[in-house]
């Protein structure tokens, strides 16, 4: 009787579905350092014993670092857990879908959760801490426009906005929106982000 019930249960059971994240994280290949994205390492995957840690040298906020990294560490792991740059956040569990881990790497915005640390040897990196230490106008503009509510997403927005203003000193609202398209604000303060960036742009142009 029990065996018959088990057979019926097995027939009626629906197969489980593995959630595959949508967007660039699922399908991306290549190096995040060069503007593309790469699938994040599978958590818990055993690394073959033939793969050994390597020494990586990088410059972060103007300071040189040399450290041993495991082959499955992401750049975010290194920046946040090893070097203490806590502005590098984790909102989307490493799927490259939120922008909260954004940094500037070799002059371009990059998702640090999508970059393998071992591939970042020789990289020049700037985090939100470096932008704040340099007293960039974006910092004051974000404060004066009450842009942050929870503040969790703010570092990623600031990093992305800095790169935008370096390449476009007078961006339109649509250009700002396009630049920030990969950054999520869970408090919904998008209009304030735009105002802050516009104000910082005016300061950088000497108009404020």
Q: What are the residue ranges of the model-derived segments?
A:
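Signature of N-terminal electron-transfer/Fe-S-associated modules in redox systems
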Residues: 2-208
